[in-house]
Amino acid sequence: LIFMFIGIVLFNLFLSYLIGKILRLNKLYLATFMIIATFGNTSFIGFSYIDAFYGQDFIVYGLIYDIFGSFLLLVSIGMFIITWGKGKKNSVFSISKSILLFPPMIMFFLTILAKNFEIPKFIMLTTQNLGSTLVPIAMIAIGMKLELKNIFARFHIVSVAVILKMVIVPIIVLLSFKYFYGIDQTWVKVTIIEVAMPPMTMAAVLAIKGGLDEKIAINSLVLGVIASLFTITLFVQYLA
């Protein structure tokens, strides 16, 4: 499953690069487009949809997709694309440094180490409460950058990115599963729903922090979340 999930995201990334080239986007816009059109909100929104439609038992598939298909690729290939789009020099050392010093990656390794020790309950509760505020705070930060007068800025790029991410790629994946595996198994349905998630908040934050185009990143988040109410419903109904 891990290699399959990674393959799906890499295919999405390759397709977004081709579409971006067809649109003749400059390097800055192309990098932003690739990040937004590839990485989905597979945890915060994805887990909520999985829990609502298929139950908590199947969140584990979403978790595997989120870690290996979203998180690890975002902090590796995604960081490379962001620095490339901004025109910075890329090297194995600089990319490795960015990955290792990326706060979520640091916490990932600390968590692995912490599993060998008995953590006091109050610390666990505190970290859980702090963790639950991550996405809301990120959304507030994004919202503060959103200007209504610019809501339709770069709309031709934003709309193509959202359609590619939430409609075209999920349909291709769905048809592939239908041909090779069938779509009756719940893990297949969960995978398709994860693929169809709107653009990832953290990806947009990293894109903005890395100096990529704010308007494309922010407007794609807004349009993606709104569109997901309809697109995810249609996918779930078809898969039912």
Where are these regions (language model features)?
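Alpha-helical transmembrane segments of multi-pass small-molecule/ion transporters
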Residues: 1-240
